Curated annotation (Swiss-Prot):
SMART domains: tRNA_SAD (SM00863). This is Alanine--tRNA ligase. It comes from the Bacteria. One of its GO terms (biological process) is alanyl-tRNA aminoacylation.
């Protein structure tokens, strides 16, 4: 009989088993891989890939992990099959040049049969068709009959990292759910009978460019056991979704929807499974610092959240619900990943924001798509799909998914064509790019040798003019007053790159002076943008290139300060923070980073203190060029999305910060002087921005602030230290005055409202009064409605107003006789508010609502009166 274990016990049992076999238990790597070329962690071996590829030495000979993974290539199959997921955990044991094939197979068998207690007769191993060694081990060492060992082709049982490099055969373990069907017809493709639960990869070859295989000096083992699959087997449930890893989330969603999973139809069960799977994905992604966006892994997150919301609606959930199911997921995952509980607030805030935003999109888009499908087209046109995307933010894949439910397809080619046409229109309308100059620069890059950059060590250098442009055309010479673009054979001028601005300075010749305002890079050519102040400049002229040293020093101070800022953010705010962009100028720095909430004032102060401490400690900075694999092995931070060559420049502030960076920096942190954060704000969904200053700019900033404080002291006739108390007193006085004004407004509203009693119209046994009051706030409106109903006796009162803030306010008050006739104030006023672009509700006898469009208020009130009179007569 198989062991009856929870998902958490299966995970811990696996790790403990291999720890007892000399493996070091390592924590799961982030879902955000170190390698910026990979979007998400998709396999248990990915964190060890540099070791398998020979790019990094292993710190231990044996390791075991439970690795969180996300794959979305089969997202449409999630919920449709028993075992497809976007989020899953891969339990793995790894050997780096230590044990190999025989030991890996023996331990996999021992774990399966003695620890998890799987019946041996239910386990079917597969091997690569040419791997006689593995076949013999299964037959002779383990004792599996030959006819049960399945030989498979390279497509199924041979692993490779690419067309060249380390590779090798693998052996997979399958569990047989129906052994009574016999061994004479073993078909591992029959996934209703067999489930692959453990894969053993034997990396023993290196494939060269000719496709030839040569034995590796150090042979490695890479294995993966699917946690969800093993849970299905040991817990005796029909699919992965009904294991204790996922089913509690499904039950939470079903409870919110008011349904029972077991009694639901297949379509409803599919939606519940999608919610159960995707919620685990989004919780882990946000916990690892990913925020929703329209690009890269941020878009994967956004798409998963949107699928959760939509499938929630498909099972009958009306409104927000995602944080409730996320809480169940967090409670399950925190056993192995405590960071999900630590970052609970961040996770739920991001989910709430995305859900609210998408609900608006979904309601509008589904309505329009429904209208399109009601016309019974053979296919949703590309233009219609693009209009939904462009006007309402309705994603193409969601249009495809909804259309597929009705048996329709979407014209993807037509969508792509409409998208391209819009992009072409945008490009043709964009007049800011000088295409002539750009074309000339591109031609220049094809004919001029790359510029030799000397600026890391030299601030002045001899140089020769390699090419010269004026007004987008290459010329042989240019005279005083000309705006020019100059290519030199070598230069100390830094070209704008990595967020750092280009250097300024001068080019001085025998009879010519050129002021350089900017330097850009076209391929590997440094283009110096400037103006000839004196003389004539010719191609071939020899010049002295001199950068503005004061400006460079300020830029360097700001650049090193930017590195310190990122280190401080990781230390103080969240270690998962990553750079999303930057600007390093002589007068300021700007740092964009992935984070979905404001950095608190207390954290800002702590960050400033930490950075100024590092500055005062006078850390020597170090730069070194090394292979990218070595840099990553040392822990150097890379910016996602940046493309790096085989060799990279590493800027290190020992013990503080280490980043891949091609910019210029101070030699010692003490050269920065001072650091001050000026602003912190959000600039996009999930992206925050800090603007800061360093060095002399801080003193200038403080002088300006000091002048402002002195001015305020004079105005308020208070010492600087007394200003907060003085302002607090004035605010309290203003608040008191506002309350008095509100009271007067309410009294005036009551006086005005009582003048409306004559407008009440009889409707059967009750009276109906619907009217608009000018400039009355919601509370005063509520008071007036209650007073009017009291005066009317039995009746219905609906009042509307547009207060000073410019939004619609509505109140409905119904007497018992009105309610007896089937009308409820909450539902009625909510429906009326929708006409004004809003909503609301409340009790049957008294309710409030609001709207965004004051221009629709008069029509909405007119409609309310007609409805009440018609229903109450």
């Amino acid at each position: 009989m198989v062991a009856s274990l929870s998902g958490a016990q299966i995970r811990q049992t696996f790790l403990d088993f291999y720890a007892a076999k000399g493996h070091k238990i390592l924590p799961s790597a982030s879902l955000v891989p170190e390698d910026p070329t990979v979007l998400l962690t998709i396999a248990g071996m990915l964190p060890f890939k540099p070791i398998f590829l020979g790019q990094r030495e292993a710190e231990v000979p044996r390791a075991t992990t439970s690795q969180k993974c996300i794959r979305t290539n089969d997202i449409e199959n999630v919920g449709q099959t028993a075992r497809h997921h976007t989020y899953f955990e891969m339990l793995g044991n790894f050997s780096f040049g230590d044990y190999f094939k025989e030991q890996a197979i023996a331990w996999a068998w021992e774990l399966s049969t003695e620890v998890y207690k799987l019946p041996p007769e239910r386990i079917v191993p597969s091997v690569f068709e040419e791997d006689d060694e593995a076949f013999a081990i299964w037959r002779d060492k383990i004792g599996i009959p030959e006819h049960r060992i399945q030989r498979m082709g390279a497509e199924d049982n041979f692993w490779a990292s690419g067309p060249t490099g380390p590779c090798g055969p693998c052996s997979e373990l399958y569990y047989d759910f129906y052994p009574e069907k016999g061994d004479d017809k073993i078909d591992l493709e029959d996934d209703t009978r067999f489930i692959e639960y453990y894969n053993l990869v034997f990396m023993e070859y290196n494939r060269d460019s000719d496709g030839k295989l040569a034995p590796l000096k150090n042979k490695n083992i890479d294995t993966g056991l699917g946690l969800e699959r093993m849970a299905q087997i040991l817990q005796g449930v029909p699919n992965n979704y009904e294991t204790d890893l996922i089913f509690p989330i499904i039950e939470t969603a079903a409870k919110i929807a008011g349904i029972k999973y077991k009694k639901s139809k297949a379509k409803t069960k599919t939606s519940l499974k999608v919610v159960g799977d995707h919620v685990r994905s989004v919780v882990q992604m946000i916990a690892d610092g990913i925020t929703a966006s329209n690009v890269g892994r941020g878009y994967v997150l956004r798409r998963l959240i949107r699928r959760v919301v939509r499938h929630g609606q498909l099972i009958g959930i009306d409104g927000a619900f995602i944080t409730q199911v996320a809480e169940t997921a967090i409670a399950s995952l925190e056993v192995a990943y405590p960071e999900v509980r630590e970052r609970e607030k961040i996770i739920k805030t991001e989910l709430e924001r995305e859900e609210a935003q998408f609900l608006k999109t979904l309601n509008r888009g589904e309505k329009l798509l429904g209208e399109i499908m009601a016309k019974k087209p053979k296919q949703i046109s590309g233009k219609d799909a693009f209009d939904l995307y462009d006007t309402y933010g309705f994603p193409l894949e969601l249009t495809q998914e909804i259309a597929a439910e009705q048996g329709l397809t979407v014209d993807e080619d037509g969508f792509a064509k409409a998208m391209k046409e819009q992009q072409d229109r945008g490009r043709s309308a964009h007049k800011t790019i000088d295409l002539t100059v750009q074309s000339a620069l591109e031609q220049l890059a094809a004919t001029v040798h790359p510029t030799d950059f000397l600026g890391y060590t030299d601030f002045s250098a001899k140089a020769k003019v390699a090419a010269l442009l004026v007004k987008g055309e290459t010329v042989d010479q240019a005279s005083a007053g000309s705006e020019v673009q100059i290519a030199l054979d070598q230069t100390p001028f830094y070209a704008e790159s990595g967020g750092q601005i280009g250097d300024r300075g001068y080019l001085n010749g025998k009879d010519v002076v050129v002021r350089i305002e900017d330097v850009q890079k076209e391929s590997d050519i440094f283009i110096h943008y400037g103006r000839i102040e004196r003389g004539t400049l010719e191609v071939g002229d020899k010049l002295t290139a001199q950068i503005d040293l004061a400006c460079r020093r300020q830029v360097q101070a700001h650049h090193t300060a930017t590195h310190l800022l990122q280190a401080a953010l990781k230390n103080i705010v969240d270690e998962s923070i990553g750079q999303a962009g930057s600007l390093v100028a002589f007068d300021r720095l700007r740092f964009d980073f992935n984070y979905n909430q404001a950095v608190t004032p207390e954290q800002i102060q702590e960050i400033e203190t930490q950075i100024n401490t590092w500055i005062a400690e006078a850390h020597t900075t170090e730069t070194e060029v090394m292979p990218i694999a070595e840099a990553k092995a040392k822990g150097a931070v890379a910016m996602f999305g940046e493309k790096y060559g085989a060799e990279v420049r590493v800027m290190d502030v020992p013990g503080v910060s280490m980043e891949l960076c091609g910019g210029t920096h101070v030699k010692n942190t003490s050269e920065i002087g001072l650091f001050k954060i000026v602003t912190e704000a959000g600039v996009a969904s999930g992206v925050r921005r800090i603007e800061a200053i360093a060095g002399p700019a801080v003193l200038e900033y403080l002088n300006v602030r000091d002048a402002v404080v002195r001015d305020l002291s004079d105005r308020f006739k208070a010492k600087p230290e007394e200003l907060p108390e003085r302002i607090t007193t004035l605010q309290a006085d203003l608040k008191t005055a506002q309350k008095q004004l509100d009271t007067l407004k309410a009294q005036l509203a009551l006086v005005k409202s009582e003048q409306l009693l004559d407008q009440a119209e009889p409707a059967g046994e009750v009276k109906v009064l619907v009217s608009q009051l000018e400039g009355v706030d919601s509370e005063s409106l509520k008071t007036a409605a209650g007073r009017l109903l009291q005066k009317l006796g039995e009746g219905a009162v609906v009042l509307g107003s547009v207060p000073a803030e410019g939004k619609v306010s509505l109140v409905a008050a119904f007497s018992p006789k009105v309610i007896e006739q089937g009308l409820q104030a909450g539902k009625f006023v909510g429906a009326i508010a929708k006409q004004c672009g809003g909503g609301g509700g409340g009790r049957p006898n008294l309710a409030q609502a609001g709207g965004r469009d004051p221009s629709k208020l008069a029509d909405a009130l007119d409609d309310a009166q007609k409805q009440l009179l018609a229903q109450l007569k």
